[in-house]
Amino acid sequence: QPKPARRTYIPKKNGKMRPLGIPSFEDKLLQEVIRMILEAIYEGHFENTSHGFRPNRSCHTALNEIQKTFTGVKWFIEGDIKGFFDNINHATLIGILRERINDERFLRLVRKFLNAGYIENWTFHNTYSGTPQGGIISPILANIYLDKFDKYVNEYVRKFKKGKKRMRTKEYRRNEVELSKARIALKNANDDCERENAIARIRQLEKERVNIPPSDPMDNNYARLVYVRYADDWLCGVIGSKEDCKKIKEDFKNFLKEQLQLELSEEKTLI
């Protein structure tokens, strides 16, 4: 039977205190074995959009992913799950684990750690939900829990996609037509004067072209959604309208509430 964790606090950036549960040495060893087993089972099935608490991934790989894939986005949705680590539903988590793990003894052991409780000021407290921050198995359990959300979002991304490429702007298309005419004029020039005029016209149009946006950012027939998650923080980039963003936020909020019993923070989830 795991022992209750020792509750301690560390300061957060906003001045508040973050609770940590420090397990005993024996429990740390057992948790590390559980973590290794869970990693062997789940690591290969996690989505590439997840970067927190994973081998060879970090906040730096998440930032690189944003730099590579968030090009051309018009809107950002910054997601914050209210008290995520404290509100993981134990029954839902065990149900998710049971989908891949057919070993009830192992699942009971995981549940014992979830229900081990903590001691603060010499008083024992039960834990009915959440995973203790500071526990060795907490990060991978959090990823397993939110992998359901990752898979939902990535399917949402595929359905949201609309159009093959953005429509060209009127100015860019006009420039293309004029440039084509100038090149034909150069090809059909009868003397040096006509040739020089055509070359000058081509250079002028090419110079103007540099300052003309080629694609229309307001094209309603083109839409894209990109997503990256690090631990319980996630970010979406949207090529679409603000109404699209509001619908995405509402859909994500409903999925988290109905499927994972989690709540989006209205104050911190921003468009």
State what each model feature region is:
Residues Q1-I271:
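Non-catalytic terminal/accessory segments
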